[in-house]
Design a protein with these regions (language model features):
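N-terminal secretory signal peptides
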Residues: 1-7, 11, 18-26
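Short low-polarity hydrophobic stretches
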Residues: 12-13, 102
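Residues within well-ordered alpha-helical secondary structure of globular protein domains
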Residues: 15-18, 152
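Structured, non-membrane catalytic/scaffold regions adjacent to prosthetic-group chemistry
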Residues: 31-260
């Protein structure tokens, strides 16, 4: 097993901020709607991010496990069967005509087929998936390191974040702007365990788990692991994208930095 040096982020927050949270939020149902409270919480999130970055080297690995540790059942949550017409068309053909678009602040925009991605250098890792809801599962993932794709696209100097646009729409509105999206900083994009997974437990990724491609960013919580990835974009800021918080759940109040 490798990379067992990691930080329990939720434990850190609980120890460092429990008293302050109780004093600020106890008995006040709508206090979190106040702008000044939002600023305090945003500052706490940034403090957590900076502290964890200081304690962990950029290349510190999430713990990896053996095949004997694999969960008997890996829970599928969030979207498990997207009904968007374009996605259903790809499912029907086994993703034969699907291509991953890579653009934004890159010198060489890409359009990569499933077979082209599978032909790239790959990484296999057995890691634990920690959900913000409190459950965890251990699974085996194989995919192309995100760094390989980004290097092929040749990021421009002003690129700071990588954004992932997905096929699923949790609101079922039929509006593309409501589809799932996520973003990570370059330090996480280039982490050796950050991969675009196309296999799970030695099988081609199933629809329920994000086929054809799912992001694995192993040092963060599960909602950062975007499923059904259709397009990747390199950007210099995330504040101008949709709700301005950098992700589907983040726009609804979750923390953008979900390190564990």
């Amino acid at each position: 097993m490798s990379g067992e040096r990691f930080l329990d982020r939720r434990g850190f927050l609980a120890r460092g901020l429990a008293a302050a949270s109780t004093a600020l939020l106890g008995g006040c149902d709508d206090l979190s709607d106040q702008p000044w409270v939002k600023r305090v919480l945003d500052s706490a999130e940034e403090l957590t991010r900076v502290t964890q970055r200081a304690l962990l080297t950029p290349q510190a690995l999430a713990r990896e496990y053996s095949e004997a540790d694999l969960s008997k059942e890996f829970k599928a949550n969030g979207s498990t069967d997207p009904q968007e017409p374009d996605y259903l068309a790809h499912v029907k053909t086994g993703f034969a005509d699907w291509k991953l678009a890579v653009g934004g602040l890159v010198e060489q925009p890409l359009s990569l087929s499933f077979e082209e991605l599978r032909a790239m250098p790959s990484r296999t890792q057995i890691t634990r998936h920690d959900c913000v809801e409190g459950w965890s599962c251990i699974g085996k993932w194989k995919g192309v390191p995100l760094s390989v794709v980004l290097d092929k696209a040749k990021l421009k100097e002003n690129a700071r974040y990588i954004v992932f646009y997905c096929a699923d729409n949790l609101f079922d509105t039929g509006d593309e702007k409501d589809r799932y999206y996520e973003s990570i900083a370059l330090v996480d994009a280039y982490h050796p365990q950050t991969i675009l997974a196309y296999e799970m437990n030695d099988q081609t990724l199933a629809v329920a788990h994000g086929a054809p491609l799912r992001l694995r960013v192993e040092r963060q919580l599960g909602y950062k692991m975007a499923k059904y990835v259709m397009r990747i974009e390199a950007v210099d800021q995330i504040a101008t994208i949709r709700g301005g918080r950098g992700g589907f759940w983040e726009d609804l109040g979750y923390e953008w930095y979900a390190g564990i």
